[in-house]
């Protein structure tokens, strides 16, 4: 089962309020988003309001488990709000990887190091990271065997992999839909079990949920499909 799951929309609102109360909210204001639409800026700003729950959940876990001096790698970091959040919180050894070479943050290059690449052949030294994060990216072009093999390679023993993704307990047929030029999957219960198996075969163990979840109806509607978000956390043994 997942480590955590978004069960109602209020959790998104509450997560954003928490980030704002800690001065850790970096998404554009409504006015900035309006201006971007006016000038037809397809790149958009940092982050996504709908990902507030994922981002805040990940930040809280990192804040509780990872030292400020540890190396943290964010997968699919282009426009990621997590990177500036962690930097503002005091983390100074941040790394990011993305296929988009235009990824830029207003952060000292000694404190954030970006490399162009994909998740399945990362230009990252083995056993160099204490934490790898992936906010809503693994469902695009997903290759479970390749992903967990490579994440396990770059993680130090005891390090964590935190992944949020699109989820619904039963299978949703997305009819070969693609986003960002990549295949897309809404993970279901069977796919999560397979994910756990990929992790186990690469010396990674899932952090179990601390509670049961009352998921009665979808929270997210996107591209004609109804689902929610979930998070799985694994620790390298």
Language-model-detected regions and their locations in the chain:
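Class I SAM-dependent methyltransferase Rossmann-like catalytic core
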Residues: 21-22, 33-65
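Conserved class I S-adenosyl-L-methionine
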Residues: 68-78
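A conserved beta-strand element that flanks and buttresses the S-adenosyl-L-methionine
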Residues: 133
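A short glycine-rich, Lys/Arg-flanked "PGG" loop and its adjoining helix->strand segment in the class I
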Residues: 145-157
């Amino acid at each position: 089962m997942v480590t955590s799951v978004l069960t109602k929309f209020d959790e998104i609102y509450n997560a954003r309020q928490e980030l704002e109360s800690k001065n850790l909210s970096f998404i554009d204001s409504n006015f900035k988003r309006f201006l971007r639409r006016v000038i037809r800026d397809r790149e958009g700003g940092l982050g996504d309001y709908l990902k507030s729950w994922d981002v805040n959940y990940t930040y809280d876990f990192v804040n509780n488990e990872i030292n400020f001096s540890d190396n943290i790698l964010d997968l699919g970091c282009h426009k990621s709000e997590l990177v500036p959040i962690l930097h503002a919180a005091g983390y100074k050894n941040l790394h990011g990887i993305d296929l988009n070479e235009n990824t830029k943050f207003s952060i000292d290059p000694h404190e954030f190091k970006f490399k162009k690449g994909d998740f399945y052949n990362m230009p990252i030294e083995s056993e160099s990271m204490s934490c790898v994060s992936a906010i809503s990216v693994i469902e695009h072009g997903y290759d479970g065997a390749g992903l967990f093999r490579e994440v396990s390679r770059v993680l130090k023993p005891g390090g964590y992999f935190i992944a949020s993704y699109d989820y619904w307990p039963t299978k949703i047929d997305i009819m070969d839909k693609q986003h960002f030029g990549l295949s897309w999957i809404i993970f279901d219960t069977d796919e999560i079990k397979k994910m756990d198996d990929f992790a186990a075969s690469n010396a990674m163990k899932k952090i179990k949920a601390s509670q049961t979840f009352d998921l009665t109806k979808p929270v997210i509607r996107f591209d004609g499909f109804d689902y929610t978000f979930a998070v799985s956390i694994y620790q390298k043994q």
